[in-house]
From Swiss-Prot:
It comes from the Bacteria. Keywords: Ribonucleoprotein, Ribosomal protein. PROSITE patterns: RIBOSOMAL_L33 (PS00582). The keyword Ribonucleoprotein applies. Pfam families: Ribosomal_L33. Belongs to the bacterial ribosomal protein bL33 family. InterPro entries: Ribosomal_bL33, Ribosomal_bL33_CS, Ribosomal_bL33_sf, Ribosomal_zn-bd. One of its GO terms (biological process) is translation. This is Large ribosomal subunit protein bL33. GO terms for molecular function: structural constituent of ribosome. One of its GO terms (cellular component) is cytoplasm.
């Protein structure tokens, strides 16, 4: 029998801020889902990826996938 894969799914959430028509600052709400091996990577993931809501590359930080 094969071993179970140890990788977990994590959510990478955009840190970009979008200003609404009323002047409020809100998160864009855009995210990516990635696999991560907790045995090899102990730090939280951070990537610079494209956010289509703000149309630029921004920092994405790891959050818990619900």
């Amino acid at each position: 029998m094969a071993k179970k894969n140890a990788s977990l799914l994590v959510k990478l959430v955009s840190t970009a801020i979008k200003i609404t028509k009323t002047g409020e600052e809100k998160s864009t709400g855009y995210f990516y889902v990635k696999k991560r091996n907790p045995k090899k990577l102990t730090k939280k993931l951070e990537f610079r990826k494209y956010d289509p809501v703000v149309r630029r590359h921004v920092l994405f930080k790891e959050e818990k996938l619900k």
